[in-house]
Amino acid sequence: MHIESPIKRRQSTRIYVGNVPIGDGAPIAVQSMTNTRTTDVDATVAQIKSLEKVGADIVRVSVPTMDAAEAFKVIKQQVSVPLVADIHFDYRIALQVAEYGVDCLRINPGNIGNEQRIRSVVDCARDKNIPIRIGVNGGSLEKDIQAKYKEPTAEALLESAMRHVDILDRLNFDQFKVSVKASDVFLAVDSYRLLAKQIAQPLHLGITEAGGARAGSVKSAVGLGMLLSEGIGDTLRISLAADPVEEIKVGFDILKSLRIRSRGINFIACPTCSRQEFDVIATVNELEQRLEDLITPMDVSLIGCVVNGPGEAEVSHMGIAGSNRKSAFYEDGVRQKERFDNDNIVDQLEAKIRAKAAMLSKENQIDINQID
């Protein structure tokens, strides 16, 4: 029930990764990457399905060898979410997975080889209508660019990206997106800002090697939040040294916080103090776990007392304002006659939220695959 995002998205061209639209106003796609051995087909398929379950629009899979390429063929047959093959060093692997129905090829300009090899990949991608991601990384720039700039800079990342954008332009290939990732927030942000002014193609956002679950989430939220608030970005990945499922959750939380794209429940909860009349922290944690399966966008406020409780509840789909023994319950901003027992709020509120989610119009849900 909160206001729509004031962010004006950067205008970009449109590509498709499988059936997922990227750019030109399409919802920002959230993706992750498997961390299993790709040759372990069962483990990789299981992880992809777990990512899809929490909302992943696209999943990237590392394909470091020809054996991994053969495994990719089997994996692709067992999942429905679009797959990006992550290719480094050996361009021939890209040609191989293209035969196996890959939905997008990620190549690293710093190690994929000379222009002739890139031409081979582009020709294959064009023939099979496969988009490419030019994935520049501050830790693996071309040797001549490293020598020129001495250290990763925004200008260095931009030069690497534009070098390969120019190659694709010369080859008359426009089905690509670009990323210029760095582990330093300001370096990444400055690089993306420069790139956004240079090209019209979609941009894939990320703070690479951001760190563990807590610190990496914060670093990613700061960096990507800066860019997204400026309208920059068409797809994103949160790079965490953690379960990839967490990357998807954090990605959606960032988009939800900026009101760019909502999926599931947006909990507004107080940090608690001695005025709380029910256990807010335990209630939030339990409801988050129980309601992970819901995709309907909803705002639910859980405030432990009457100081801010009524005000937050009045601008939420549902809200609780803590009171002695029984707390006030609000729906669509209106206080209801029904009150919730403070010792049983979780069960009561879960039932109300599920019923409300079932009633909300499907027009409020974003199906990224149905965007024209």
UniProtKB/Swiss-Prot annotation:
Top-rank lineage group of the source organism: Bacteria
Alphabetical UniProt keywords: 4Fe-4S, Iron, Iron-sulfur, Isoprene biosynthesis, Metal-binding, Oxidoreductase
Coiled-coil portions: none
Residues engaged in binding [4Fe-4S] cluster: C270, C273, C305, E312
EC assignment: 1.17.7.3
Cofactor: [4Fe-4S] cluster
Free-text cofactor note: Binds 1 [4Fe-4S] cluster.
GO annotation, biological process: isopentenyl diphosphate biosynthetic process, methylerythritol 4-phosphate pathway; terpenoid biosynthetic process
Role according to the record: Converts 2C-methyl-D-erythritol 2,4-cyclodiphosphate (ME-2,4cPP) into 1-hydroxy-2-methyl-2-(E)-butenyl 4-diphosphate.
PANTHER family: 4-HYDROXY-3-METHYLBUT-2-EN-1-YL DIPHOSPHATE SYNTHASE, 4-HYDROXY-3-METHYLBUT-2-EN-1-YL DIPHOSPHATE SYNTHASE (FERREDOXIN), CHLOROPLASTIC
Family classification: Belongs to the IspG family.
The protein, known as: 4-hydroxy-3-methylbut-2-en-1-yl diphosphate synthase (flavodoxin)
